[in-house]
Amino acid sequence: MKNPVNQDTLRIPSGYPEPRDILRKHFPIIKDELCIRGGWGYDQEDAVIVYSFDEEINPKQHFDGISLEKVFINYRIREETEFAHETKYTGVNWERTGHQLVHGDNGILYDRETVEVTMFTPEAWDFLKNDWESHNGYKDDDKGKLHHEALREERIIRFTEVFWFNVMNILP
């Protein structure tokens, strides 16, 4: 089951609330850090606009753009996999695989981030968890552990996501 998910089906649906509002609602821990406006960042036209300062969010603190981008990447992926669709995923992780500064035709400087996302269906996660626990974590069983890793690799879902950030408001 290499990749039963078309990553386009994970995109935030049209008509969904703006990221600034919905992410602050679903993830209150970041409500005082999310100095963004704009879209979900799927392309230049939908870029996330990053601010180092936002009086409405937190008038006492300035943020660096890179940290805000990482926060946004993490929580957009969580929004896509936990809230925006009927199907939920678990064991979701991501790793940055690329970064590029792009000068748009409109004169705007964009930060284009590429990440690899890995996740599991709940059924695959439960299967792997039960296998691991029923074999006591394969303690002292290297062959069994290798077999478990093969089972994990068969069930993992991998895909690449791109994030576009308008960084004009964080330039010195």
Predicted regions and their residues:
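Cysteine-centric segments in proteins
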Residues: 2-110, 116-172
